[in-house]
Design a protein with these regions (language model features):
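Conserved donor-binding/catalytic core segment of Leloir-type glycosyltransferases
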Residues: 118-120, 283-303, 309-312
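Aromatic "clamp/platform" in nucleotide-sugar-dependent glycosyltransferases that forms part
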Residues: 375
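A short, active-site helix/loop in glycosyltransferases that binds the activated sugar's phosphate group
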Residues: 230, 238-264, 272-274
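Nucleotide-activated donor-binding/catalytic signature segment of Leloir-type glycosyltransferases, i.e.
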Residues: 337-354
Length: 466
């Protein structure tokens, strides 16, 4: 590329990281980010200024790389600005990656294609303890237990996992990320890459696939029903052999949006260990305080933890006694704690912080009701874990809810944001303790019948890994 050419990344959001890593792999410097969000125009990201899109016309010699899932909208915007010819596509970047691999001396690497297939499970972009990472770790461990060669790809900045998962994990640093991932994948050919985040590891897998098309297969997993996540995975769909969706609703949406054939798109109910089930409280114990449980990242995006304060207000308006235990950490934690202290609700609302996975079963066995106020989900693992312990779900109408909850029979599903109705259903369960017990038993039965871990791994081996 011309040394005088300015390189600009259009998109300063969560996907900027992987584009930065891709440019690092290519030894390509970039100069600016740009973004349509005006609140970012005074900030720097990875040391680079974020400028308004209106400034792009100031650079007659520039290349613009769209580092956002809103690719089509941004392409249209740039075309209307007369800058369509400045766009550098991902395909162009991958072509450069292919040239780099051809020129790079690989003599020091053992890239002999072996007989045994290695399954590489992507966990790199996650925070280390979110639902996607725990799902990835569980899948890897299950496949390893079934005799498959498996590695988890994680980051050095993530917290350590349980020992049984950590022994399967290769930690990649943020320096030269994609280069190290490419080398790891080459050393483990042939391999199947399980794409969970459409991030740096996905880019590395595509680079390897372009050079070894018969020895690298990619399976993409869609973990929630956010359309932007669909786009992040499907922008490079020609490199993907199969799609796995964590709910049947997501599969339906994917097939509608992308006209995908059934043989490419799969779904199986999430696995939950149900060997130790809670003994549900007898119907006669009607005087115990009702216990509510919430376990998720305390963040606004997706989880809408900022609405927990409003939900607590709605509970208080109902005038019944309860204990609401909140397990998690994040940007909304201090705000919730301040509200609880200011209104002297410490006896009713307890913030426990993030609990390790090993303590979650005990947490749910203490609760009567599972609360979820998310704006979108895949299939909530917390919900399934809680239901397996006999907790009655009172949740928003997100993906996966209707697959396990029949409204009014084993739980309640409310419109997204309808906190008053959620509080009303909680109050009704407080008044009808027999219903609380019967709903809880039904929850345990459906999880035991449909979420068998062994069957889940068999399904993956038969349908996704062959």
């Amino acid at each position: 590329m011309d040394g005088d050419c300015i390189v600009i990344l259009f998109g300063a959001g969560v996907y900027a990281k992987k584009y930065k890593a891709l440019l690092e792999y290519l030894n390509m410097e970039f100069d600016y980010f740009t973004d349509n969000d005006s609140s970012k125009w005074t900030m720097k990201l990875y040391g680079k200024p974020v400028i308004p899109p209106s400034r792009l016309k100031q650079f007659p010699k520039c290349k613009i790389i769209i580092s956002s899932t809103h690719e089509q909208a941004i392409r249209k915007q740039l075309a209307e600005m007369g800058l369509a010819d400045k766009i550098m596509s991902l395909e162009e970047l991958y072509h450069l990656c292919g040239q780099k691999m051809t020129k790079t001396d690989r003599s020091g690497l053992d890239i002999t294609v072996r007989d045994n297939v290695t399954v590489l499970v992507d966990m790199y972009e996650g925070i280390g303890w979110g639902g996607t990472e725990l799902w990835a770790a569980g899948l890897a461990f299950g496949l390893k237990s079934a005799g498959r060669n498996v590695l988890l790809i994680g980051g050095t900045e993530q917290p350590s996992l349980e020992a049984r998962y950590e022994t399967l994990t290769i930690r990649i640093t943020e320096q030269d990320t994609i280069m190290h991932m490419v080398e790891l994948m080459e050393q483990n050919l042939p391999c199947i890459f399980i794409n969970n985040f459409a991030g740096c590891a996905f880019m590395a897998a595509i680079i390897v696939k372009k050079k070894y098309p018969d020895s690298m297969h990619i399976v993409s997993v869609i973990h929630n029903d956010n359309p932007s996540l669909f786009d992040a995975h499907m922008m490079l769909s020609k490199y993907i052999e199969k799609i796995f969706c964590v709910s049947s609703q997501i599969r339906e949406h994917m097939q509608e949006q992308y006209v995908m054939p059934n043989q490419c798109c799969y779904f199986k109910e999430q696995p939950i260990e149900t060997d130790i089930l809670r003994e549900i409280r007898p119907d006669t114990q009607v005087y115990d305080v009702l216990r509510l449980g919430y376990a998720a990242r305390l963040v606004r995006q997706q989880k809408r933890a900022d609405l927990l304060i409003e939900f607590i207000k709605c509970l208080e308006e109902r005038g019944f006694d309860y204990i609401f235990q909140i397990a998690g950490e994040g940007e909304c934690g201090d705000m919730i704690m301040d509200y609880v202290r200011h209104h002297h609700l410490e006896r009713k609302v307890e913030l426990l912080g993030r609990l390790p996975k090993s303590e979650m079963q005990a947490f749910w066995k203490r609760q009567d009701i599972f609360i979820n106020i998310s704006e979108y989900e895949g299939t909530s693992l917390s919900m399934l874990e809680a239901m397996s312990c006999g907790c009655v779900p009172v949740v928003t109408d997100v993906s996966g809810a209707k697959e396990f909850i029949t409204h009014g029979e084993n739980g309640y599903i409310c419109d997204i944001g309808d906190l008053k109705m959620m509080a009303q259903y909680v109050a009704s369960l407080d008044n009808e303790r027999k219903k609380l017990a019967s709903f809880g038993r039904k929850c345990q039965i459906i999880i035991k019948e449909r979420c068998n871990p062994e069957e889940y791994i068999k399904y993956w081996i038969k349908n996704l890994l062959n």
